[in-house]
Amino acid sequence: ESPENTYLSSKLKYYLYYRALNEVFTFAKEYGKSKGMDVKCYVPTHSLVNYSQWQIVSPEASLASLPCVDGYIAQVWTGTSREPNFFDGRKRERVFETAYLEYGSMESMTAPTGRKMFFLTDPIEDWPRDWADYKKNYQATFTAQLLYPNIADYEVMPWPERIYEGLYRTSANSDKKERIPRFYSTQM
């Protein structure tokens, strides 16, 4: 895979995603209007911090130019925030710090537009871990989002069936799996 092909394919994905959102959101709003409803359309997206870490091209910032976009859902959670990064010459996971930067980049992107922003956190993540790890990192991302007083809308449980019905390891050193522990489900 050449750098030129990577660039061109990323440029194509950017264009197709931008166009698809414009068409789908415009249709949803027009259809809603024909039924007497004011349909709001929000883009669920990771932060530009995360996309740069994962080397993904996104039209995220350009979406502000689309009148059909009412705002964003900032998809920040352990899976994005635990991506190792460099600080003071050392590469390691910094979940709280990275989450804080991710939420900040999302707030900064929308603040000038006046559009609505939802901050998302997820009590688990896509990679198989244990309940103690999920809880520790969930609390780090949850705390990071609360440090943005201008944001008052949250998506706190994006996939409830995955959280409450999923089986995950009881500890890092065990293969035993259980549903969410009582102490953690109460916190949710």
Task: Locate predicted features.
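Generic hydrophobic, helix-prone segments enriched in Leu/Val/Ile
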Residues: 1, 9, 184-188
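Short, flexible, mixed-charge acidic loops at enzyme active sites
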Residues: 1-2, 138
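Active-site neighborhood of glycoside hydrolase catalytic domains
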Residues: 2-41
